[in-house]
Amino acid sequence: HIQAGHVRVEMNGIAREFERMFSPNRNVLTNADGYKYSQYLQYPEGTTYVASYIETRVGAKHSRILWCGLQAFLKETLTVRITKKMVDKMAKIAKSAGAPFNYDGFMRIVNEFDGRWPLRIRALPEGAVVKPGTVLALVENTHPDFFWCTSFIETMLLRAAWYMTTVATVSKDIYDLCLCTLVEFTDLKGEALEMVLKFMLNDFGARGASCHEAAVLGGMGHLMTGFRGSDTTEASEGAELYYNHN
């Protein structure tokens, strides 16, 4: 028995049940750019495999990137099962916009894969600090008929990853600056230094976030750096749900 608002998934061969923080009833098919709905028609005939990767652009402001955000996306969004109701609703939206829609393709996912995306995502461990231009995650289809699914999730994946990664990267730079300042200008050492450092930058970002979800992701990004001072309570809940950290 799975409780309402919970989802059961298999990861690395182990079945796990976890709770979602946000609505499990939203239509995941609307979570894409408008041009994505016609993109399946634009691939060359005979295409069976598409692999797409995400990376940070070389020449960006930061010389290193703290990568994070994937677990929240996987557990909160990609595990939402596609249903006939979602497909029918999206077909109606596409028709009103005069856009093509792969109704038969999505219905095959509903009927043949129990609503699960036929995709595989491989990625660097979250929390990794890498140079710009490093591949962070790779998405690929697991069935030759569903090569078009790879790029369909681009919008939702990038939004989930970049916001949390950006906050974490900025906070990491500040964390390291605070560490250097303490080492150079104080006599603190060991546990005393670590305790002061953890709480030098407190997160009050929840009130300025655009929505609850942004507060969770941004707050978790801040906590990824080593800082522990946070008044964004929902970020602590997210860290426990998505990363088993309390």
Can you say where each PLM-predicted feature lies in the sequence?
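Residue-identity detector for glutamine
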Residues: 3, 39-42, 71
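Short, positively charged
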Residues: 101-109
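Universal eukaryotic N-terminal targeting presequences
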Residues: 1-12
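Buried, small/hydrophobic-residue-enriched core segments of structured protein domains
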Residues: 14-61, 109-118, 122, 127-246
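Poly-acidic low-complexity segments
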Residues: 8-10, 33, 69, 102
